Amino acid sequence: MSGTRASNDRPPGTGGVKRGRLQQEAAATGSRVTVVLGAQWGDEGKGKVVDLLATDADIVSRCQGGNNAGHTVVVDGKEYDFHLLPSGIINTKAVSFIGNGVVIHLPGLFEEAEKNEKKGLKDWEKRLIISDRAHLVFDFHQAVDGLQEVQRQAQEGKNIGTTKKGIGPTYSSKAARTGLRICDLLSDFDEFSARFKNLAHQHQSMFPTLEIDVEGQLKRLKGFAERIRPMVRDGVYFMYEALHGPPKKVLVEGANAALLDIDFGTYPFVTSSNCTVGGVCTGLGIPPQNIGDVYGVVKAYTTRVGIGAFPTEQINEIGDLLQNRGHEWGVTTGRKRRCGWLDLMILRYAHMVNGFTALALTKLDILDVLSEIKVGISYKLNGKRIPYFPANQEILQKVEVEYETLPGWKADTTGARKWEDLPPQAQSYVRFVENHMGVAVKWVGVGKSRESMIQLF
């Protein structure tokens, strides 16, 4: 061993210095992202909260889902509809980023952009960056989505109520390792074409009635490839640079919601991706220590689209009133939403999974006309109170909800712009939610516009 030194036989002092530097480097985790997530079954008004935060954001990103999500944002009296584009694209000073966890239907992306261009959205393609690792939704994925729904209806007498945007079939291809990504489309097109044909044939063998114009679709895809090429980056490197360069405000816009999450939602009536906080790390390629504030968006009552258990649902004049006053129709599907009282069991469960740092309580004004308002505070199963949210749908159908009845305010809140403008009973309603959740409410929404979000702190 002469002439060499054992690794643990270093000259005094050298190891300590190196370790200290590494500890400092580890401590410099970089910027933290702010996350906005739905805390119920979607349609909570996430777009409005994102829009509020996006005004001073440097980067606004989507991390999961596809054009099955629907966000409506009103700016200067104009209503923009977003499905795949981050709604931060309205902010001309921000970069919008579509992460690897998102599934992208290119025809849908350009169609959506063109619709919003007609309403005044300018130069969006200069502000959009797309991860090269994002998977592609093909037209046949969308066709299969519809065929699967028909099959489910025939076999089980019920369907999931998907948006038929091809999201589930695309995530299935991804999990089966047969999917194709943006990076595949932009490299060797012959190789891409061969894999595309294989994938198309696989789907045709499973669904014999499926018709696919393979050559026509490939021709269109080749055209889209050239249009998106300038927007595509290595998404992991892009996010790393964004978080470790000069300080930046990075906002993550969740699509869908906690109870639609593939793991934690009311399975099987869920979407096909993780729309809870874990999906931010896997869908953007960032570590947990870069997650900052996580804002949960909560509607002042509860809505749900399609079938599945809904403990606080009101199939009566209260449900109709909420549906009509709240204009509860889906942005993506136009379907009527089911309505019911606020359910704190759902919210506590969403908080367990996501660790909300604060809440946004939206559409409080919809409750303005009620003389009393009920809030679901706990569930009973076979006469016993249960502390958890049941995983099994049949059990969730059977729970008995315990309600607390609060006085209504019977006053118009739509003109309120600060906390003091709200009637005392409306303030009590907000505080009741805070106290039961153990999470502060940061915003209260009393209307459609940006100005109607009251900030509390």
From Swiss-Prot:
Keywords assigned: Cytoplasm, GTP-binding, Ligase, Magnesium, Membrane, Metal-binding, Nucleotide-binding, Purine biosynthesis
Residues that hold IMP according to the record: 43-46, 68-71, 163, 177, 256, 271, 335
Region ranges (Disordered): 1-24
Binding site for GTP: 42-48, 70-72, 337, 363-365, 445-448
Regulation: Weakly inhibited by AMP non-competitively to all substrates. Inhibited by IMP non-competitively with respect to GTP. Inhibited by fructose 1,6-bisphosphate competitively with respect to IMP.
CC cofactor: Mg(2+)
Residues where substrate binds: 43, 331-337
Family that this chain belongs to: Belongs to the adenylosuccinate synthetase family.
Record-given protein name: Adenylosuccinate synthetase isozyme 1
Organism: Mus musculus (Mouse)
Gene: Adss1
